[in-house]
UniProtKB/Swiss-Prot annotation:
Disulfide bonds join 7-138, 25-41, 73-230, 117-184, 149-163, 174-199. Keywords: Blood coagulation cascade activating toxin, Disulfide bond, Fibrinolytic toxin, Glycoprotein, Hemostasis impairing toxin, Hydrolase, Protease, Secreted, Serine protease, Sialic acid, Toxin. It is found in: Secreted. This is Thrombin-like enzyme BjussuSP-1. It comes from Bothrops jararacussu. The keyword Cytoplasm does not apply. Belongs to the peptidase S1 family. Snake venom subfamily.
């Protein structure tokens, strides 16, 4: 996260850390057995750590999990990495809530333009050279009007995405923050998907998967209906 500060150790009990060979992502715990991240964070072999703050100084209640099942939208266009950029993961065993671990529920309402949204992650805090912090960084940005975003990206973002940033630039998610949450007015509204080639370019806000549009798909999969499709 660019332009932020170290997150408070107690403000992100739902934020988890996904790591594989040579890369990592954020993810969000939504209940005792399920987490949500970006589809582009998938790999054949990854582990997830919950209850993490510092990567060097471990919390006593940290828990590590492997994916038991992974779900991406069956109607996702596989040739487009960023189409329907959401993945639902069932953990290999349930998590118990603890001091640094607690889920964030799915949103009950869609987000509104202008909302103040919190971003967080262990991604780079500098550009163009990347610097990865030991603890997650947090910043507040704003939800931007969809049309503004389409203009900035030549019509690229799909309707099931949100745009958020600050127009003067300098505050943004960055490399390594993918898959983490966008929390607007206390609700889990977005998943970090992509952004301008260089993070923090004001006129090009970050692009986030719109969680509200996928709540039905998520709930159906959790209930065992794995044939559920996502919105177009």
């Amino acid at each position: 996260v660019l332009g932020g500060d170290e997150c408070d150790i107690n403000e992100h009990p739902f934020l988890a850390f996904l790591y594989s060979h040579g890369y990592f992502c954020g993810l969000t715990l939504i209940n005792q057995e399920w987490v949500v991240t970006a589809a582009h964070c998938d790999s054949t072999n990854f582990q997830m750590q919950l209850g993490v703050h510092s990567k060097k100084v471990l919390n006593e209640d940290e828990q590590t999990r492997n994916p038991k099942e992974k779900f991406i939208c069956p109607n996702k266009n596989m040739s487009e990495v960023l189409d329907k950029d959401i993945m639902l993961i069932k953990l290999d065993k349930p998590i118990s809530n603890s001091k640094h671990i607690a889920p964030l529920s799915l949103p009950s309402n869609p987000p509104s333009v202008g909302s103040v949204c919190r971003i967080m992650g262990w991604g780079s805090i500098t550009i163009p050279n990347e610097t990865y912090p030991d603890v997650p960084y947090c910043a507040n940005i704003n939800l931007v009007d969809y049309e503004v975003c389409q203009g900035a990206y030549n019509g690229l973002p799909a309707k099931t995405t949100l745009c958020a940033g600050v127009l003067e630039g300098g505050k943004d998610t960055c490399v390594g923050d993918s898959g983490g949450p966008l929390i607007c007015n206390g609700q889990f509204q977005g998943i970090v998907s992509y952004g301008a080639h260089s993070c923090g370019q004001g006129p090009k806000p970050g692009i986030y998967t719109n969680v509200f549009d996928y709540t039905d798909w998520i709930q159906r999969n959790i209930a065992g209906n794995t044939d559920a499709t996502c919105p177009p």
